[in-house]
Every structure is written in structure tokens, then in C-alpha cells.
Amino acid sequence: MADNKRIVLAYSGGLDTSVAISYLKERTGKDVVAVSLDVGQGGESLETIKQRALACGAVESYVVDARDEFANEYCMKALKANAMYEGVYPLVSAISRPLISKHLVRAAHQFGADTISHGCTGKGNDQVRFEVSIASIDPTLKAISPIRDLSLTRDVEIAFAKEHKLPITQTEKSPYSIDQNVWGRAIETGFLEDPWNGPTKDCYSYTDDPAFPPVEDEVVIEFKEGVPVKIDGRDVTPLQAIEEMNRRAGAQGIGRIDLIEDRLVGIKSRELYEAPGAVALITAHQELENCCLEREQHRIKRDIDKRWGELVYDAQWFSPATQSLNAFIEDTQKYVSGEIRMVLHGGRAVVTGRRSDSSLYDYKLATYDSGDTFDQKSSNGFIDIYGLPSRVAAARDVKFGNGIEVPKNTVE
């Protein structure tokens, strides 16, 4: 039976969720259990975050080391889908919310809570991601957000934190909202809300300035069925692969993203991201797919990848549609094995070599030199058949006076 005196809170250690603990206690009279996940975000130690939750009034606070789970089951799905929302954003925050939601539901079951709370505002995507994910796992649980439901602004939150002496470092002079994990880092609010303002150096943490790179870094990444398994000949787990590429690509300033983004809630927002490891790995994975996927399969997968990214961005990780797309994507990866060589330098990850036993690239068919096995005479019949619909349609257009106009000869 649910204990109505307890609420499970998704706790990040930041301003919104620290304020949420006190607000929940004051407004509901219920005890708050704070849940924090280690998804490779680094920064403050989890012990520090745990103690802060307790200092802010949580009755219990515990953390879950979910780094390998996040890398294996979430980042790798995003990698196989070459997930880039609107062509540039590798879903840094979007893929972590379903994992966090799963552990929140588990904690709610463990502690007998009937309510899960988060610290999201009413303008962001994450409120939708948390609540839709929670409902997809256990529709009997209630989800609330004191920050959103009370329409609290950031300056009011800061004042509340000061008044209640909550141990947070955020100030009115440094009001950035940062979300980070091993897949990347998101920075928003503050002066960045004016889209004309350029990012300053203090915005960045995962990447160095690409204008002043160190010497170029050559790396060879080996994939097995779409998953990185070796870097420069050394065995790596997915987590280790992401972490190493974060360091190496980040040192070269790779993965800085600055865009106006279409949010799920219907507004446009200015977003700043750093995702050096994700960008480098996706670049390598895409090139290996270029070698290993059959043409029509590849064309369809590019469409599927785009739709997968949109669904996951739009809080549909657990939806039937996403699960069906996962099945297609996973099937395409059975031959995506091989090595990609890249040069990392000055903000760019450039592929310089690729090899795979399952590659569909056939040198003898592709070469223009001696040894060419492509029968060029076959092209005549192919063109006749391929161009037949165009010829028939053109004849019809000419008949009705709608043929394509050709410029008259003006040469005298």
C-alpha cells in the first residue's frame, strides 16, 4: 500500500530540485526521498549531492551508479540511430530522462510512494519526458512539479534558496542552467537567452577552444554490430569509448553546438551544447554504415534515424513507435562492423580511412583502372529502362504544349 507521506524526487543537486525539496515539504507535509543517478556527469561528487539533498530537507537521499547502463542501453541506441535532432543535437538530455524515470519508478515502488516529483519548469521539454516516461512504466503513479505548478521564476528560486539558507552555488550573477552526462553537456539561460549574444569561454567545460588546437590526433575506432569495441587496438566498453573520445575530441574543440531549437512545448529556444565524444563516434559510425548498408536499406535508415531522433526528443522513448524503429535499426547493425580511421583537429573529426569485412564497397567494380569488372555496356539498357517513365511523360507534355522550354540559339 502506498505511503502517502512520501514523495520520490528526481534530484540533480541544482537550483530547481534543491528548492523543490523545501517546497514539497512545506506545501504537502510529505517526506521527500531524493534520488540521484550517476550518468557520467562528473562535476561535484555524488556524496556532495547526497549531503546537499539531506541539508535541503530530504528524509533520505541515495545515488545510483548508472553509468554503464546509460552507455550500453541508451547512448548506444542513440549511436546506432546516428541521433542528431534537427541535424545537429545528439540528444544529450533527452536520452537520460527515460533512464532516470525508470529508476524513479523503481524507488517509488521500493519506498511505497505514490507520487514522483521533478524540478522541471513549465517551459522545458524535460517535464514532458519525465511524466510521459513515468506514465509509460507505471500509469498509477502521480507526477508533479512544484517549480512549474507554482510558476516560480529563477530569481524567485534564488531568493527562496537564500531565505531558507539552502546550500547551492547558483547566484543571480551566474544563472546558467547546466545539464550534463557522459554523452554531452547542455547550457542555457542567462545572457544566452539573447540569440545575438555569442558564447563566452566560461560557457564551455567539455571542449577546448578549437581555434587553438594541439597537434592533430589520429584515432582508429573498431565497431562490432554498430558498437565501438576497440580504440587504437585496445578493448573498450561503450562507456570507456565515450569517455576516451570525450577527452580526445574535446581537446580538439570538437562537438560545440549553438542553435535555435524547436522545443516540444512549441517555443523556440537558444541552446548551447558540448558533445565531443558523441559527435566523433556518430561521425565514425555513419561512415561505417556508408560502407556496409545496402543502398535502399541505407536510404530508409536515414529517414528512420531522423524520425527516431524526433520521437526520443519528444518524450517517446518507451512508445510503441520507438520500439518498432529500434527493431529496424538493430537489424541494420548486424553487418556494421569494421574500423574507421579519423583525424581529430581544430573542431573537426575527419574520416581518412575505413575497412570492413562486411563492406559492400567492391574495388574491382569501383575502379576506373585496369582490372575493372563493371560491364559498362550494361548501362545502355539500364538507362533505356530507367528513363522510360521520363520519356513517356515528356511526350505527353509536348502533346499538350507543356514541354520544357529550351532557350533559343542566340549565336549569330
From Swiss-Prot:
Gene3D superfamilies: Argininosuccinate synthetase, chain A, domain 2, HUPs, Single helix bin. GO terms for molecular function: argininosuccinate synthase activity; ATP binding. It catalyses: L-citrulline + L-aspartate + ATP = 2-(N(omega)-L-arginino)succinate + AMP + diphosphate + H(+). The keyword Ligase applies. Its EC number is 6.3.4.5. It is found in: Cytoplasm. It comes from Bifidobacterium longum subsp. infantis (strain ATCC 15697 / DSM 20088 / JCM 1222 / NCTC 11817 / S12). L-aspartate binds at residues 121, 125-126. This is Argininosuccinate synthase. GO terms for cellular component: cytoplasm. GO terms for biological process: argininosuccinate metabolic process; L-arginine biosynthetic process; urea cycle. PROSITE patterns: ARGININOSUCCIN_SYN_1, ARGININOSUCCIN_SYN_2.
